[in-house]
Amino acid sequence: MSIKTTLKLTALSALTALAYTSHAQAEGKLTVYCSVQNVVCEKVTQAFSKKYNVDAQFVRNSTGVVLGKIKAEKENPQADFWFGGTIEPHLQAAELGLLESYRSPLQKDIMPQFKSLMEQRGNFTSVIYLMELGI
């Protein structure tokens, strides 16, 4: 799968998932906790805003910081959606009951080596990008 295809799938997956947030649909506003590069956060939220006529804003933090915020905000969530970051904190948040279940229809397009993970844990997370951390 090419990087261009991967980036397109990332954007499509994010837009599809963002469209299902009830808060955004009800109030015309969306707050996204974003744990990827700032430029990606900006492009995804801008594309969503344009496509769905919703005021989408993002708060950029590392995955660990976002997990801490979500834990602290359990009784009064301040964001509608968490996009990006490493998978372990997403799985931990799901186990703690901090995330709503959602399965992306685009999971069928995930590379074969990640299919089993998505079949087991895909109600709370989805592979949206792949990045080398070292060689």
For each predicted feature, which ranges?
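Short, flexible, glycine/charge-rich loop motifs used to bind or transfer phosphoryl groups or to couple energy/partner
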Residues: S22-H23, K71-A72, T125
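Residues embedded in well-ordered beta-strands
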Residues: T31, G134-I135
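Bacterial N-terminal signal peptides that target proteins for export
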Residues: M1-A11
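C-terminal segment of classical bacterial N-terminal signal peptides
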Residues: T16-A24
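A structural signal for short loop-to-beta-strand junctions that line the ligand-binding cleft
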Residues: P77-W82, E100-G134
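Early extracytoplasmic/lumenal segment of secretory-pathway proteins
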Residues: A26-Q92
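Short, linear, compositionally biased motifs with a strong N-terminal bias
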Residues: S13-T16, E88
